[in-house]
């Protein structure tokens, strides 16, 4: 074959670019740079840190009696050398000394090689495989022991450390004879080394892969089997490599820092790069389960071969970066991508996704379907964008993949869209203003910055509110110096934020709830006995004494250095926080200096709002630093401060970040003079992000009535041209407001392959050029604001075609890895989406949290909110009730609350108005014509749709299409039937629980709302007719005047089935059985039986609980003493209005009253045994945290509250 292979040959040597500062593990073929000469001495200082802590060597307790005499002698010699000059010593002694000092640095091994030679260093490393230092909470106790074969690390593996692995570098650089002698020593030592450590020997001898191949078959304890994973770096025997597929938990090819679950790995990337360099494409299969990780993926994406992109395609749905790597790969290597896609689509059963997480069997079909659609879309995109590609790849493919490509090539071509007929298109799609030669631009003016004094403003009562918070009151009772006198310095350091238990600090120490920590069942379960007292007794660290001295003397730098460099400092950058409630009690100047240095060091903190309320404008320099480091978290703090330095960063937020636009708007309007003074000069500079952000912020001020202020500030430059030029810019029409630079179209932008928008007037599809203009308008989107031309587009184009176009755009964006910079493709759904879009998007939102895409799910909720149609809000309400993810439900409820407030409704009132008609206002909506077959739908007592055929036979499921069905009518009828069934099921799941809650909480409706929401609503009336309703006076919503039902004809009938009239000023509610007499209940029950009416939930037969006179006058209910219920039964009470409180209590809120049910022994909500028995202890009622009698409660409310515990403790 004469044609050149369009990708790498199978045996090619891979040439990769490595991350900055990263290189592969060395090899004798690729030894790399020589080791630098060590000038200082680590050997001479080994162990000296112990003496600094203990002051004298005799103060240290040494434990190493379990060693052999040879080892005991070596360890004793090592101990004697601590603090002394260290001459040449035996290798075993050097290993013991390094172990005691816990020095695992590369520099130490470099010095040993430099000073004693490589063979000696090899003996030291071998000896290190036999000795370990145990963890001791007391720093003055040193315990050494053999590497124990039975001691397992679980998910941790100490197969190597930096000191040991550094030997590989020196061996790579060694002369052949020296290397051979060292290799012989390592191989000879192998049988005596514990099995968990043996993979390390293979790791430092990559030139002898047979060692790794042999070790694969070695049986080892379960606790040590994780270390075998490192053999993947060296093994090359296919059988051995296949056996290693079971070992993956250590994620050896990814760099990471230490965490609770695993040790750090600083050589994952280097190991992956070394494997690819040494074994080439043969290494690809074993990397499949790591391909979705950054380190491995960043290397694979550089390799032009179908096998590589095949691997990347198989893991593409694991995370967002994996999708982005596929997008990058198919752009750089389209031939290999097309070949791999053809091969995958040719398989009758594509391979499963490799590695973790495992997909559940029930989710496999959906995952495989989505993956198949993704592959087909990608293949079509490649072939459409590069038509010559298939012919160039075809010769290198086998028969079946060739057939796949030929089937796409032979498919009927899409109709060609006339690219020149613009006669019927609106002006915006023919000649948009940004393509015009006459564009308005700001003149260039050189304006010096204006100085304006910073200001601070607090809302009335805000500072007092902050001072009254629990932490502020707890920590402000005395100065910090007085606090140190009353408590120990170590306790104050613990309160300040020092220590290693961040969770306990944030949840109990910072809020000042130490007693609650001691009594918390969760804390008792989570910590071993006595640990809480250890923590609460103060910061127990060798550095505590120095820190206490620094705090007493006001030595801020020393205190910050200890914070960063004590034994626990590697946890601090991400978690630990300074307690600003406590720092605020320092002398003012010291507190301000501390605040500034904390922010210069980018440390975290808590209590900042209180701290700023105390120190005011003096704290502004530190606040500016905090805002520059963490703008999202700090933004709410700056609202109280007006400063010109804040104007530009706030303007950028207003321009670009939708999530915080409201805060940015609030700041700009609260500090208009500071905004104008800082931003007017920027408007007249070179077009840039800064000038655009400045103009948008000033335009906001102008639109909100601050024109005179802007003119006043502009005139301060004493130039007549400033205000005239600025005013002209501020008065620009909405069509002239767009970015100076047109953003480039992303790689996923292929609109010719998507559904095209069609014009309303003549059903014509828009042209190719018009599609590009639409894309440009969409890319103008910033901070959630759309270009005004897109709103015009909605008036010219058919809504359903715009929705289909937006969905295809969104799908392409997702398949490209959902790049954040192109988020406009997601936001387009909020502008063009219709009811169908809302349903489809909801399906994805519900799935995203389980896929690790919680942030995207929240963005999806925002898009549903912005869609401005009731179906989107119905879906939002459905998510708030039914999502598996608790945070997602809470977020959906928050969005609904905002919508309700904007409409002047409560959430319940909004939900009432969001019940769709489902088309039932059309008499034919429940009839479905399949041609020869006819079906109708009725609804059962739970509002579930039930399907009947023309013989009135109930169908078990949705009918399938048959060959004799009408080819036009049947598919349309089936789609409509499925849609009705899905929507009705979803609505009923929300409607029925809401109506039962309305019964329980005594909701009432006006007569007009009752008619519109229940009687006349085509879907809701189905359940309205199965309930008993009550008429109540407006001033006494618990006083039942009369009860009635809604007859099928729409009449209101009483218990005697006689029509009645409802007073116009009355309130309507679902009648509670306790409100009705026994006779009335009996009559309605007989009436419902006669008409065969099935209520949607228990109403007449509802469980009721009435207290005895003695119980009513008591403040504690004891009727269930001696009774027990399971944890599962208690958790079930959450669906009846009860909420889980502490570990041994449930709470039921009744307005200003609160019922508290106590049980014992209690349970941990994070570790629930649903069958565990809990004994009833007490049930009390509280108002304002004071116990009151049950007589104060409404009888009906109390009955509803007590019905759930009455069932489970009965």
UniProtKB/Swiss-Prot annotation:
- Output the Pfam families linked to this UniProt entry: DUF4132
Which family, according to the similarity comment? To E.coli molybdate metabolism regulator (MolR).
This chain belongs to the protein called Uncharacterized protein YehI
Organism this protein belongs to: Escherichia coli (strain K12)
Q: Where is the organism placed in the taxonomic lineage, from the top?
A: Bacteria, Pseudomonadati, Pseudomonadota, Gammaproteobacteria, Enterobacterales
